[in-house]
């Protein structure tokens, strides 16, 4: 199979879908890898490293898309790439269709096979291709939230972990999955007072067992969230319904309960966001303010640390890429239920129930 690795062109997206080591593995399995020139540069991987691995360097994205049977990307195709995708071409990337109707319609029209990293699901209901980026995003949400709390950024001027004699910030994490767990551990590790809210009592029991003493757990209800907001400095939105649009857990009216200069970080923004006042931002212009509350809603948070993110992503995606290349997507999805669940669009039809339900299809 011919595998194409185009350069990511979304705003400040510096990751690449495959490392030189990953390319070498695919080539050793009898496949050809074509990489757009400088695609890995911002992640720390040069053209020469890809060439040494056996990959071929192409100059333009048009060349990469034209030659490839399977396109591997990091982020969803953007408008300028729609026309490059052809019928029956396999596109293996994060799509997040539930928050991108225009993208969904474009991919349906293209006739491509869209296999989404975020809905590949194992028998134990874990999402193996979402986990590594969720780990990165969860940790980074605390870094970015802490910066936003600084006075020059428009925040309250609070140090997240406090100092002896001065109380730390209070962090509320909405969602106790991978993102929320990593965010809570990161915040607790630097001394913040953390509350994790989730709708699953078994998950809250588990989190209570593994978290340090400065982390509380709470059943996620509107009433409980409203009670906490007046004393909360930083809220991390980490809610996930696989493939579906995220629910709005904080409405605009609820912002009035918070103190001016408090911060919302919406990690769920790539699935529509879990705050009513959220809209996607970029690394170039990451923060805006609504009713005195700072909103950080960057849709590709891990793109800011591309070296770490690219290695973590390739570790997760490469085994699946090898299966797809060796067997072809149809046989691979017949024999591997987790890959079958990754199928979102095939031959112009939405085949992922969560996406179909979002748009009433």
Language-model regions, residue ranges each:
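Short glycine-/small-residue-rich Rossmann-like dinucleotide-binding loops
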Residues: 69, 75-76, 95-96, 221, ...
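Glycine/serine-rich phosphate-binding loop and adjoining beta1-alpha1 elements at the start
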Residues: 2, 8, 79-170, 298-300
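Adenosine-phosphate binding glycine-rich loop
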Residues: 118-159, 269, 274-361
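Residue-level detector of alpha-helix initiation sites
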Residues: 76, 136, 177-178
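Glycine-rich phosphate/diphosphate-binding loop of Rossmann-like nucleotide-binding domains
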Residues: 6-42, 152-240, 287
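Rossmann-like adenosine-cofactor binding region
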Residues: 209-291
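An N-terminal-biased, well-structured beta-alpha scaffold segment characteristic
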Residues: 2-106, 110
């Amino acid at each position: 199979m011919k595998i194409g690795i185009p350069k990511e062109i979304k705003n400040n997206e510096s990751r690449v879908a495959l490392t030189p080591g990953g390319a070498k593995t695919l080539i050793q399995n009898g496949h050809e890898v074509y990489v757009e020139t400088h695609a890995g540069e911002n992640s720390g991987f040069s053209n020469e490293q890809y060439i040494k691995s056996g990959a071929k360097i192409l100059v333009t994205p048009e060349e990469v898309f034209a030659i490839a049977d399977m396109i591997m990307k990091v982020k969803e195709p953007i408008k300028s790439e729609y026309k490059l995708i052809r019928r029956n071409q396999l596109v293996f990337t994060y799509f997040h269709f539930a928050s991108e109707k225009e993208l969904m319609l474009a991919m349906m029209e293209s006739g491509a096979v869209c296999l989404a990293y975020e809905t590949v699901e194992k028998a134990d209901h874990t999402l193996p291709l979402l986990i590594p980026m969720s780990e990165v995003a969860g940790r980074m949400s605390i870094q970015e939230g802490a910066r936003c709390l600084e006075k020059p950024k428009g925040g309250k001027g609070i140090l997240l972990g406090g100092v002896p004699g001065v109380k730390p910030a209070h962090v509320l994490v909405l969602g106790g999955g991978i993102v929320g767990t990593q965010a809570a551990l990161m915040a607790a590790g630097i001394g913040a007072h953390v509350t994790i809210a989730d709708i699953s009592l078994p998950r809250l029991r588990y989190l209570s067992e593994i978290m340090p003493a400065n982390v509380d757990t709470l059943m996620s209800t509107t009433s409980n969230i409203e009670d906490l907001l007046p004393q909360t400095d930083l809220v991390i939105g980490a809610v996930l319904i696989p493939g579906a649009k995220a629910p709005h857990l904080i409405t605009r009216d609820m912002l009035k309960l918070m103190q001016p200069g408090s911060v919302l970080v919406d990690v769920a923004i790539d699935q529509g966001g879990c705050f009513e006042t959220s809209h996607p931002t970029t690394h170039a212009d990451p923060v805006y303010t609504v009713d005195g509350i700072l909103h950080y809603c960057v849709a590709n948070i891990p793109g800011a640390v591309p070296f770490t993110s690219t290695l973590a992503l390739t570790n997760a995606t490469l085994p699946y890429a090898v299966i797809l290349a060796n067997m072809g997507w149809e046989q691979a999805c017949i024999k591997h239920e987790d890959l079958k669940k990754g199928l979102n669009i095939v031959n112009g039809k939405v085949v992922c129930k969560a996406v179909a339900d979002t748009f009433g299809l």
